């Protein structure tokens, strides 16, 4: 049974967040039996009044601890002043009359190993700025004004979703090099995202983490926005403002592993608690991190409660679940591993957790998106439970790898890799995909996106523009990491702001103009965003011209015309630096056509090649009833639509 405490409105949610549950046997038992999906309403630090006395109630799970006390600003960090009482099921609790919101605290745990360690609150709502690690008593108090957005949010399967991936610590910085406050970021980011035409932002580096170089993927504060950019209310302001501007918010969430930092979750009660005890299951050698024990109800509820904290309390619209493949397989990146009860390599406990997570989220936070970064061919990632994992979307890692491999090839040899750009069509209808070019593709000597392209600076930009146009006209939602929308030439550096000064240069501004135009077309045209998983959503016209490296395909709105469907457009890509005059491309209808977009336009940094004749010839071609004779600029993509009659000259 799910926790009956469920918010029906932001006002109700605010009330729920301010009223902790009684710390009694019944509620503790619900947590242990996985029936309490918001354990943060029970554990952690909560200002309360007991017997007319104001104070803070502290509670923590440490079943094998020998002794636990709460220390902080309210008692001079003296471990003898406020010992905690051992409660049922391995929980500890204490009421501290002298404690107040804004004060720092930790749990001083004498563990099963006899060592005494000061631990951060696993459910802490706010934390000191790194390198300090104390938790801070902090009840969230924010007046939301995004009701209109919250009432209509949806996973948006047949809506345009174009995501701008942003590392909150390095998108922009103050003149002194320090981080922007969330409120400063809110206005600057909303203005830019609106200008560029994205529908959503995906924020990484939001959850509290001790090491900047982890980019936020080694989390110690699963319930706390990082204090680098301000207080929890400041983060709430960021989300609220983006919603008021019509922009959705997704955050990266990391339930696959956690860091070994002594102050964090590691060996919390002097022995493995949140992590598997067997290092063959519980330790990532590649990442030097621990793996959550998904078989423990208390751990499962800790993670599910964290997800709901962001989706309910902070009004976030979706979670991008990191490193799902590492959770699904017991032999992931390891030579020594423990088979499951059936002798297989699948982590059955992690699979059960992911299914439960998605079921709870879709029940408790309807309209939110759950997105899996899953890099294998695990079946049914976006299929409903119980047979699938229940995610809404999955990153198209296969599309990304194949497409980047192709575009990194010298055009002379691309004909030998022609299939790399058509193979996605074989499996694209099997899942709900997001075509993601993320931060992972522009670090660790992989080069920035434009720098991956072969040739001189002009051809690199031409090739990158063609890549972007093919990405935006291929079925699937879109995600592009910050800086790549203006062809940043260097790899991402998390310690520095983006090089915004280059956007004043025409060659970078041109790529920026193209991304803006692509977002506009994508949002305006249903043929480009409806029917991603329909066979009829993309029809190949020319998929076999390997010698010329030319591709042509139709994007179609597969809905019946009575429901507003039937719109279509034609994309033609010439992916060599060779001008092709009068190239024949089959089309399904006669009459006039017009160019919606050419990546060779001068506005985008190209030469502005013209199309003198866009009247379809009656001779069939490529299995179609008619054909066009097109002038294909070098390293370019054209997007055309059928207009039926001769367009006016100003439309050409």
From Swiss-Prot:
Transferase: is it a keyword of this entry?
A: yes
Keywords, in A-Z order: Carbohydrate metabolism, Glycogen biosynthesis, Glycogen metabolism, Glycosyltransferase, Transferase
- Organismal lineage: Bacteria, Thermotogati, Deinococcota, Deinococci, Deinococcales
Q: What reaction does this catalyse?
A: Transfers a segment of a (1->4)-alpha-D-glucan chain to a primary hydroxy group in a similar glucan chain
Kindly give the InterPro entries that the UniProt entry links to this protein. A-amylase/branching_C, Branching_enzy, GlgB, GlgB_N_E_set_prok, Glyco_hydro_13_cat_dom, Glyco_hydro_13_N, Glyco_hydro_b, Glycoside_hydrolase_SF
GO aspect biological process, one term: glycogen biosynthetic process
Q: What is the name of this protein?
A: 1,4-alpha-glucan branching enzyme GlgB
Q: In which pathway does it act?
A: Glycan biosynthesis; glycogen biosynthesis
Indicate the residues that form the catalytic site: 322 (nucleophile), 373 (proton donor)
Subunit structure of this chain's protein: Monomer.
**Any one GO molecular-function label of the UniProt entry:** cation binding
Q: What does this protein do?
A: Catalyzes the formation of the alpha-1,6-glucosidic linkages in glycogen by scission of a 1,4-alpha-linked oligosaccharide from growing alpha-1,4-glucan chains and the subsequent attachment of the oligosaccharide to the alpha-1,6 position.
Record organism: Deinococcus geothermalis (strain DSM 11300 / CIP 105573 / AG-3a)
Give any Gene Ontology cellular component.
Answer: cytosol
Enzyme Commission number(s) from the entry: 2.4.1.18
The keyword Glycosyltransferase is assigned to this record: yes
Family, according to the entry, reads as follows: Belongs to the glycosyl hydrolase 13 family. GlgB subfamily.
Q: Which Pfam families match?
A: Alpha-amylase, Alpha-amylase_C, CBM_48
